[in-house]
């Protein structure tokens, strides 16, 4: 089972990724983890990537694709894999297609922007422990205070409404075209096209999980 999981920040991808990994016993592969591992191992591609990273530049797509091809040859990928946060752009998706990296399913977790802003801007965090709350969905016993210590909760910069709105803008500009790319490819019925599935990310986590796993044949 080879899966790409798409969706905006705050759509609940991380939660569903865990369910998919467990159901199919496949590794979750992120480009960040892959880059760090290759740099640490000192592979040729890892050293090449490190040069770009050290200079503050973006690692080029051909290096990323090379790392992907290396990673999916590992023993833990024999039953498949789940790509998390990759590909991010159409050139990366095209490069992956040209490199012969076949995908079975592309799953999009679809949540409206206003719901994502509500979810993320309502988060409150107790910084010393990392405990998180939500003003609507999981409020603390006393507003603005940690349940355990009684200390103040804060809204992290990442969770502020204007920051969330900016991240969504980047997502729509950069990643949303991938949704069209994969859905059009699937609709054309090409022999090696992945199946494209859009699942609503609204509602109970368990129901979304059921729909995702059912779409993947579980």
Swiss-Prot record:
Keyword Nucleotide-binding tagged: yes
The protein's enzyme class: transferase
Top-level taxon in the UniProt lineage: Bacteria
Catalytic activity: AMP + ATP = 2 ADP
Stretches the record annotates as NMP: 30-59
Keywords for this protein: ATP-binding, Cytoplasm, Kinase, Nucleotide biosynthesis, Nucleotide-binding, Transferase
LID, as annotated region: 122-159
Binding site for AMP: 31, 36, 57-59, 85-88, 92, 156, 167
Entry's EC annotation: 2.7.4.3
GO cellular component: cytoplasm
Residues holding ATP: 10-15, 123, 132-133, 203
Cell compartments where the protein resides: Cytoplasm
GO biological process, one term: AMP salvage
Domain commentary: Consists of three domains, a large central CORE domain and two small peripheral domains, NMPbind and LID, which undergo movements during catalysis. The LID domain closes over the site of phosphoryl transfer upon ATP binding. Assembling and dissambling the active center during each catalytic cycle provides an effective means to prevent ATP hydrolysis.
Function: Catalyzes the reversible transfer of the terminal phosphate group between ATP and AMP. Plays an important role in cellular energy homeostasis and in adenine nucleotide metabolism.
Protein name: Adenylate kinase
